[in-house]
Every structure is written in C-alpha cells, then in structure tokens.
C-alpha cells in the first residue's frame, strides 16, 4: 500500500463479497444467491448512521482545512511583512495540506461510501499519485521548518537563508516528493473483478511486478514508513528539543525576564504540540498499512474498512491542525488574519516599517546589555 492509503484495499472488498451472512448462524456462498439478489458488503460503513458520521467528519476536516490553509497562503501573499523565509515554508506546508484536503478526502469518502472505484482509469493512476505527492511534501516541509528554526536559534547563525534559497528548497521538496510518489502512479491496475456470474465491481489496486504477493509492495511500505514518519519524527523531535533547551537556558536581562519567560512558555507549548500532533495523527494509519502488507489476513477483518477509515480521519486532522499551530498560535499571523478580514491593507506597510525600526533599536540595546539576540526574538514569532 502507498504512503497515504487513500482508498481501502480492493482485495478486502472482494473477499467480503464472496461470503456473506444469509441468516443466523450460517453463511451462503455468493454463487448460490437468488437470481434477483445483489451482493452487498456487510460492514459498518454500509450502515446509514455510520455513513452520516463519516460524511460529517470528512466535510468538517475539509472545511477547516480549506479555510485555515487558504488564510495562511492569503496573508503571506497579501502582506509584505509576512514574506519571510520561515513564512514561505509555512505557506508551502499550507499548499500541500490544501491539496490533501481537496485530493485525498473527497475521493476517500466517495470510495468508502460506494465500495468500488467510480472515477475511471485515468484518475485511478493520477489520484493516488497526487495524494502521495501532497502528503510527502507536507512531511518534508514540516522537517525543513524544524531544521530552519534549529539552525537559526541553536547556532545563532547570522547568515540567514535567502528567499531565493528558500524557493530552491521548496522546489526540491516537490521534486523529491514527485519522485518518491511515482510508484503509486506506475504500479496500479484498473480492472473489473467478477464476484459472481453477471456481477462485477470496478477495482483500482496496486499492481507490483512479480508474483501476486510481491515483496515490492512490502518494501515500498517499509520505506514509506521510514521516510514519511520515523525519520521526520526523529529530526523534528531532536530539533525542537534542542530549541527548547536553548530557550530554557538562555539568560535574559532583568527588566525583561517576565516578558521573555512568557514567550518561551508559548514557544515551548507550540513545539510540543507540533511533535505530538505529527506523531499521534500519522502513527495509526502508517502502522495499519504496514500490518496489511506484512500479514494479508488483516484484510479479512470484518471491520477492516471502518478501522482504515477511522485511522485515515485521524491522520487527516493534521491538515487543519498545522495552520492552527504555525498560524493562529503566532501573534503576527493572528494580526494578519484579522487585517485580512477587515481589508486593512494599509496596516501592512505601517507594521513593516515600525516593527523593523523598533526591532533594530531593541536588538542594538539588548546586544549592548548582553541581552537576547534576534534569533531568540524570531524563535517566538515564527
């Protein structure tokens, strides 16, 4: 299975259709059904009340994700003072999450409700690829943001990344993600599967070279787990732990101790939230997909589709959590959001001039007094 598993494995759908309860205590093979009967999946996702809950859950995530990520992108484009290197990375994260909202969730919900692939052969190849691409860009960008903060705060580097370099990094993130996601487009098969005579379903499944139970699928899943979860989580956790330690041990001038203490607390909370959200949201889905590839009997679970869907919903919650963590928890973004709603374009020029002037004076005085440098100020503002 791919790194996102946007559609539940069609093999499990086929297995469930082959054998279905026909009465208390026994089952009837599909080949013995009455002539006018039609196969139906007997899992919880076919219950109307469950479908209503799933529709509400997915629609809520789509709405929150589209609004939140669109706002982040909008304020970075609209306000000149927001066009910093870190904010470019955050905007790129918002673009990737926005693609996840628009490309992952609607198709996953459609498949879950309908039980088969209804989007045609072209989208059978393109949709999983686009989904994998968006998720990988999002993960790489989260890692880049952590490394950028670590570089500026822990090592006090005076030479910051230029905007040109930041765009190059963003381009590389998309290029690497496009390459890593390519197997999801190449190794796919759009086909009709006959369940019983005169009844077929449309399937869009992974088709790896070699035998039916190819090792390639398992290798790809293990690689995806390592590249998209284990390695990024390790880098992000290490970077933010170093940042937290640096902020904790930094000594501020006596007059501003309370001010910087409060800002450190806010920064620490945000850093912890970033790591926890990433770890908790993606672990169930990655682990479940890996279990499917290692042991195909997982597909025989009666509630396979429901379990998969719940884990997928948990993972997708990160798409609206990211703009909250990187945007709304930041005072500059909050002001920009409010200004955008009020259409106060003039505030941008004023904010830019005043903030740069006051910041320069404050940093000059702080440096003379042995106070905090610019990297610590930025640490609580990114």
From Swiss-Prot:
Parts of the chain on the Cytoplasmic side: 68-87, 147-166, 239-269, 327-382
Entry keyword Lyase: no
Lipid-modified sites (S-palmitoyl cysteine): 343
Membrane topology of this protein: Multi-pass membrane protein
Disulfide bonds: 124-204
GO molecular function: neuropeptide Y receptor activity
Glycosylation sites: 11
Residue ranges that the UniProt entry lists as topological domain Extracellular: 1-46, 109-125, 188-217, 291-305
Pfam families recorded: 7tm_1
Family matches, as InterPro entries: GPCR_Rhodpsn, GPCR_Rhodpsn_7TM, NPY2_rcpt, NPY_rcpt
Places the protein is found: Cell membrane
SMART domains xrefs: 7TM_GPCR_Srsx
Entry keyword annotation includes Transmembrane helix: yes
CDD domains: 7tmA_NPY2R (cd15399)
TM annotation in the entry: 47-67, 88-108, 126-146, 167-187, 218-238, 270-290, 306-326
Region (Disordered): 1-39, 363-382
Known function: Receptor for neuropeptide Y and peptide YY.
Name by which UniProt lists this protein: Neuropeptide Y receptor type 2
Organism: Sus scrofa
Lineage: Eukaryota, Metazoa, Chordata, Craniata, Vertebrata
């Amino acid at each position: 299975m791919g790194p996102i598993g946007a559609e539940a494995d069609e093999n499990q759908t086929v297995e469930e259709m082959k054998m279905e309860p026909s009465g208390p205590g026994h089952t009837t093979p599909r080949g013995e059904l009455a002539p006018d009967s039609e196969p139906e999946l007997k899992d919880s996702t076919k219950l109307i009340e469950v479908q209503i809950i799933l529709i509400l859950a997915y629609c809520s995530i789509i709405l929150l994700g589209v609004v939140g990520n669109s706002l982040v992108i909008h304020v970075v484009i609209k306000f000149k003072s927001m066009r910093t290197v870190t904010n470019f990375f955050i905007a790129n994260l918002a673009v990737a999450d926005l693609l996840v909202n628009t490309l992952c969730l609607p198709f996953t919900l459609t498949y879950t409700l309908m039980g088969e692939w209804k989007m045609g052969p072209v989208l059978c190849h393109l949709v999983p690829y686009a989904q994998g691409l968006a998720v990988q860009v999002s993960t790489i960008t989260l890692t880049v943001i952590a490394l950028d903060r670590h570089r500026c705060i822990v090592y006090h580097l005076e030479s910051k990344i230029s905007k040109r370099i930041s765009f190059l990094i963003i381009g590389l993130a998309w290029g690497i993600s496009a390459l890593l996601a390519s197997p999801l487009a190449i190794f796919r098969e759009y086909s009709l599967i006959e369940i019983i005579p005169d009844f077929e379903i449309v399937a869009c499944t992974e088709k790896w070279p070699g035998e039916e139970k190819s090792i390639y699928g398992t290798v790809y899943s293990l690689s995806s787990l390592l590249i998209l979860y284990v390695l990024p989580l390790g880098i992000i956790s290490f970077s933010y732990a170093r940042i937290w330690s640096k902020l904790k041990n930094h000594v501020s001038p006596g007059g501003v101790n309370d001010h910087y203490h409060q800002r450190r607390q806010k920064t620490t909370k945000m850093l912890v939230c970033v790591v926890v959200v990433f770890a908790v949201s993606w672990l169930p889905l990655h682990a479940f997909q890996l279990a499917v590839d290692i042991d195909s009997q997982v597909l025989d679970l009666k509630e396979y589709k429901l379990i998969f869907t719940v884990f997928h919903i948990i993972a997708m919650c990160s798409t609206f959590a990211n703009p909250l963590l990187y945007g709304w928890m930041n005072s500059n973004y909050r002001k920009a959001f409010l200004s955008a709603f009020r259409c106060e374009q003039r505030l941008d020029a004023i904010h830019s001039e005043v903030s740069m002037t006051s910041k320069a004076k404050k940093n000059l005085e702080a440096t003379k007094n042995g106070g905090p440098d610019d990297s610590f100020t930025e640490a609580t503002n990114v």
